[in-house]
Amino acid sequence: MTSYKELGLPPIINACGTVTRLGGAPMPSRVLDAFQEAAKEWVPLEQLQAAASRRIAATTGAEAGLVTAGSAAALTLGTAAMLVGQNLGHMEKLPQTDGFPNEIIIAREQRSGYDHAIRAAGARLVEVGFNEVTSNAGVRRVELWEFEVAITPQTAGIAYVHGPGSCPKLSEVVEMAHRHELPVIVDAAGELPPRENLKRIPDTEADLVAFSGGKAIR
């Protein structure tokens, strides 16, 4: 087995927590044991996903669940679902989205490099509000009405990054979006712990919530 030392990588002291750029979180032995057991047999992946979906739904209270290769993959797949729904013809066109609604509204202050995962599905991000958090100008935060006035016939949904101090409240954004028959996708990659968020965030009735399982889910 190759160690990081053999690859010439120096040891580090992680004072950041479970961040992606440092590998998420070390896996406990029981998780590694489960990996080893699972790798001993073949399984139809669609049946495995269906079984995992039922387990995730029972744990979170959500309608269903999907295991993806990280939160970024969840955002891409979730956005694709928002863009095309059950339309097989539109599915074939992705990531080309000309000819049907392809705009996802997002608060400017919630933009980051990770939202490329949303654009990768073919969505065009429409920013609302001012970037007061980054600029520290202290004028005001994004308000709910700014999301609503940005809705056009090209709007396919709303993206929301959940975190301490996220504004406006997710529940308010969801309620407004659903009045316009639009879905809401939530990037909650960094919202574990606490474990209660596994239920608390889906309880807002957001349509899609992406959690990072490689950080704090045990």
What kind of region is each of these model predictions?
Residues I13-A51:
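A glycine-/small-polar-enriched, mobile loop at the entrance of the PLP active site in fold-type I
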Residues T2-L22, P26, S53-V67, A72-R218:
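Conserved PLP-enzyme active-site core in the AAT-like
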